[in-house]
Amino acid sequence: MKYESAYFCGYAKLPSALPTTVTNSGLTLGLLLELGTGTILDASVTLLSELAIKMVKSYVIGKNIVDDYESISQEVLYRHQGVAAKPIIKALTDIRRAYIEYMEKNSVFLRG
């Protein structure tokens, strides 16, 4: 495989009650995905608190964007007790869809 990983982004509008909304009008979730497997290698998110960023990373890193999507979404709902939970899931949904579309279009070219 010529390229082993790619960076995918998902976006969601943030509630105005969040301090992050002052600097960012929306949430951006970025995931580094292993192309052949869909495994999430790393993550970035536009939240202000280092702890919130660390929590988001703990939800996703090492999991599969397709196979583990439901369990990741459930974990976010149960563990992320802030108003950013739904935007995180929306951004994750966008990334999952983008990854599936990308692989459908490009998997033939990625085989080497």
Show where each model-derived region lies.
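Short, compositionally biased leader-like segments
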Residues: 1-11
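Short Pro/Gly-enriched beta-strand edge/turn motifs at strand-loop
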Residues: 10-18
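Active-site- and interface-proximal helix/loop "cap" or "latch" segments in soluble metabolic
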Residues: 18-30, 35-112
